Amino acid sequence: MIKKVSLMTALSVTAFSGWAQDSADSLVVTANRFEQPANTVLAPTSVVTREDIERWQSTTVLDVMRRLPGVDTAQNGGMGQASSLFVRGTNSSHVLILVDGIRLNQAGVTGSSDLSQFPISLVQRIEYIRGPRSAVYGSDAIGGVVNIITTRAKDGTTLNAGVGSHGYQNYGGSTQQTLGDNTRVTLAGDYTYTKGFDVVADGNNGGLAQTDRDGYMNKTIYGALEHAFSDQWSGFVRGFGYSNRTAYDAYYSSFTPDVLVDTRQLYSQTWDTGLRFNDGIFHSQLLSSYSHSKDYNYDPHLGRYDSTATLDEIKQYNVQWTNSVDVGHGNVGAGVDWQKQSTEPGTNYVTNDTNLRNTGVYLTALQKFGDFTLEGAARSDDNSQFGRHGTWQSSAAWEFIEGYRFIASYGTAYKAPNLGQLYGFYGNDHLNPEESKQWEGAFEGLTAGVSWRVSAYRNDVDNLIDFDSNLQQYYNVGKARIKGVEATASFDTGPLTHTVGYDYVDARNAATNELLDRRAKQQVKYQLDTQVYDFDWSLTYHYLGTRYDTDFGSYPYQKVKMGGVSLWDLAVSYPVTSHLTVRGKIANLFDKDYETVYGYETAGREYTLSGSYTF
């Protein structure tokens, strides 16, 4: 019989903070790839459910992520525009993005995943862990790991529709049904469109500003089948795909003065299948996946197959075998994962048919000894380009008073060079991985009904890959030093639920001592939720501190300072019946004018009205 929660169906997490479940009875698996009680998780971790997304009425994944501790975001305008996700001051390429535990196939050439392109309709759960995790997951996990779960929590059918500012429209539906006692089927589809707005404020892309609207359209389809062969054995097959078209502001090139490449078309499809075994203290899963993405940039008057168009095309193959066994008051896990990324001839920046292969073997362990909890992980990766690379991490927690813990951790992590840096026009196939060493200390507890956590961390990143304009090639030349403090708390006052977060991040270039671009030094985040006469209210406050960026519209390029801003969102929902719910939201309530990327406008005040029917 299919269980409501399958151990290896999807990686799930919890946290000792207000952005996550804090039940000591919850079981989680993300932190170390094995099942463990939530109160033994030593890394700072957050989880967002589908109910949270609907309460916040978020229309993009980026809007969800910006609310979480340690996260800073930057975007070249509105929905669908290019974006960056910074976790604890690290580069956007230093965050590992997983979908159902599998690496998102979007970073093969550019090196980082753009979450503005991932459809929020696919998201049923987001699980987010901060700090180094390369010893568990391999490359990219320097700043943290974001795992997007697409599996619905329960059976049912949902139809939804919404409209809003800038011509926003959304229509979708999903259903999950159990057939007999052993088979479950899920189907979903979604369509999103917005006319958008003119994103460039002053031509910071190096040319004259385009006075046009920069819209976005997405079409998504999803299907999954799960079957339990016995009480111990089960299997699944799952597939999804999406097509995105985004208009953005570009500039006329001196080489092609009659061509304006200002449209992006992304096609992505993913298929995966797996077999699970769960028998008491031993758990195992064998999983394989295939994904294929084609990312065009072109002049819409000439088409995406014109010689002036560019293409990033990546195929990705994954095989994972994970195992865990309960031992004493803890668990031991071990596994192997294999990945191959390949490009087709003609792919942007990469002129030849190339591929990268990586095989990783890892070991994890957690054990509780009285008031002490110890965990550790070690991993060895064998990469076809740069050979072997090892990482490790360890953490220890001491519950010095009941309900209060001190946690100390240290870990190493790395980021492998991407295909563009290795094999592109300016590539260097002698590049080494970027490497990180991180320390963190934290106190957490429950005081007078307030669940809180305060942590301080330092992250030294060496061998950063940068482009040398004189030599016209990529080299391992950069270094970054990041120091920060993170504090979260959650509590109730009568019918009001409060969640508060504060982030201080000092992220600097170690050679020049300059602050890294687009990272706010301070952020304050506050979430208030309540119910009044069956109306569910959600009020969000976000203070985004001053940041620095580069003005590419000047020569030579100059650093510019972007001022801080206070943003308020208000969302309300009302259950008309037990099946029908209507929702409304005002984002940027006071219509603040600000930028997260210099020279690119944000949306201003926006309104959305939506409804869902569930049966």
From Swiss-Prot:
Ca(2+) 1 binds at D198, Q210, D212, D214, D249. A motif (TonB box) lies at residues 25-32. NCBIfam families: PRK10641.1, TonB-B12. Involved in the active translocation of vitamin B12 (cyanocobalamin) across the outer membrane to the periplasmic space. It derives its energy for transport by interacting with the trans-periplasmic membrane protein TonB. One of its GO terms (molecular function) is metal ion binding. GO terms for cellular component: cell outer membrane; pore complex. HAMAP family: BtuB. Residues 37-151 form the TBDR plug domain. This is Vitamin B12 transporter BtuB. It is found in: Cell outer membrane. It comes from Enterobacter sp. (strain 638). It is a multi-pass membrane protein. The keyword Calcium applies.
